[in-house]
Amino acid sequence: RLPRIAGPCVLVIFGVTGVVNFAQGSIVGFGAMLGWWFIGVCGWPWWLALLAVAASSALIGWIINLTTVRPLIKAPPIAALLTTFAASMVLDNLSQILFKADTREYPAPLPTDDLPVGGVRLGTSDAVALGFTIAAMLALWAWLRFGRDGLAVRATAADPDAARQMGIPVTRVQNLSFLLASCLGGVGGIFFGMYAGVISPYSASFTGTVGFIAAAVGGLGSIVGAVAGGFVIGLLEALGIYQFGGSFRDLFIFGAFLLVLLLRPHGLFGSRHTVTSEPMTGTFLGAGRPPRLAWWHWVLLALVAGLAVPLLGGPVLSSVGTQVAIYAIIAVPMTLLAGSTGQVSLGQAAPVAIGAYASALLVMRLNLPFLVALLLAGVIAAVLATLVTLPIWRLDGHYVSMATLALGYIVLSVIRGWDAVTKGAYGLSGIPAPEILGLRLLVAEDHYQLDLVVLAVTLFVVFRIRSSHLGNVLAAVGSDEIASRSLGLRPRGYKALAYALAAFFAGMAGALLAHQYNYLDPTVFTVQMSVLVLTIVVLGGINSPFGAVLGSLALVGLPEALRLAPDVRILLYGIVVIAIIRFLPQGLWTRRA
């Protein structure tokens, strides 16, 4: 049901602005919580709550457009994509602060009678939701086809510049698209709450991603395709849960998405012209160059980080330092992918998870030495992540970034469902501590020193690559893909290579995490980890490896040292991303060229 509503909502905004609105699912979730408040706490009738939620959600959508999309309308769409991702984080955690994180029963304002329809029995809320979906989609189709404002929306979606020259108020049309999509999303949240029976602030946030997948499967640019894609995704989800259980739900949803990308990138009902080129991050987020440090700067930094922190800070500061170092190891090679080649990965938690479980299993099951398992973890993560994503590098547009996000969900689904190997949701426990040359590293100070050595190696390798011929080729691919192709280069192959390098170091970081915390479960490797890594890279400057270290220190070290609550921490991450992309897109450790 929700994919059928969310798909057209995402489609309307994507068509008009060229932006994948990741905040759409959060608007659905916020609408569900508002509906719970109005009906369950305030005692309003359901129809009045429906109107109030529709108006409130429309207002939220207008604010999101005003603060995160409209100011970046002339920037590459990847910038607005990241800010809507950040807006989703802000809205989810604001909802958690306002309504608390508890799961609660959703009020049932409609009768619970079963209605026989063609041999299928539907509850009253099911029938109302189905009727609303059909009516809303028909009304949306008619409005877009025959309405004056609907025609303006279609004209703006086809060519904003031409629409502006014809006198169409493009800014007002973009506002209207956000108001409409957010209104439908909020109302869909109420029906989601009625259907689910129990909700929490995070219950429906996933629907924004599923909505884009439904629209992409059906075909971007086609209302019929978006609805059909929603039905296909909903059917696959139901069949997957019925046959294999809920653990494999995401595998079917995102597996179908990847399959459609490979076989028919423009979707079941879409046309090829809707698959647009990926904007180059180097012209916006990557503007400027990072400052160069003298050799004595590096010596001083090594002394402070390697000696002062463990000696003066003790185990507490060393524990914080291990987390900073691990996230920095993941983020530093991302500067090759996002900074040099101009490709953003939204699922970097996937190779981290692969490396963590691979290293833990190699040591626990095969009794391999830790250092061997550490290197093999990076190799396994790079090979598996690259093999799964290799075909997608021939695609363009938002699809590549979304495919990396899909990989993250697929890996998590496999981990949850492969009980015989990964122990599923129970996780792996008793993972041995790192052991090097017979010396077992048990205390935080030792872990920190080990992580610092791996981080130093990572920085050395990435700096060497950036200053080499390979680094120049990667930068050329990111600067102008068409020109690099005309010179005989293979841009997609080099993008895949940059992704493999980032996955290798991410796998090693996962191995360090596994052996230092002695326990793994799927909740460690959520999309929030991927977003945090991307935030670190953007904050430091996507062309600056050392900036990634500073970003990790700011976004991981400071919140840990200040002991901020998780919801406040993620709220802070979202605000930082929006502020950096809007006001300092080149990052902190970058000077203007």
Give residue spans per PLM region:
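Mid-bilayer segments of alpha-helical transmembrane spans in multi-pass integral membrane proteins
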Residues: A58-I63, T84-D102, D126-A127, I134, ...
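Transmembrane alpha-helical segments in multi-pass inner-membrane proteins
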Residues: G43-A55, N175-L263, A349, L374-L375, ...
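Alpha-helical transmembrane segments within multi-pass membrane transporters and channels
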Residues: G43-A87, L94, A228-I233, E237, ...
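Single transmembrane alpha-helix segments in multi-pass membrane proteins
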Residues: R1-V41, I63-A79, T171-R172, L176, ...
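Helix-loop-helix "hairpin" substructures at the membrane interface of multi-pass membrane proteins
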Residues: R121-I199, I223-A228, P290-A294, L442-D521
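Membrane-interfacial amphipathic/re-entrant helices at transmembrane-helix boundaries
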Residues: R1-A6, L34, V41-A49, A75-L81, ...
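Cytosolic-side transmembrane-helix boundaries in multi-pass membrane proteins
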Residues: C9, L98, D102, A158-Q165, ...
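Extracellular/periplasmic helix-loop junction at the C-terminal end of a transmembrane helix
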Residues: L82, M89-G118, Y242-R249, P265-E278, ...
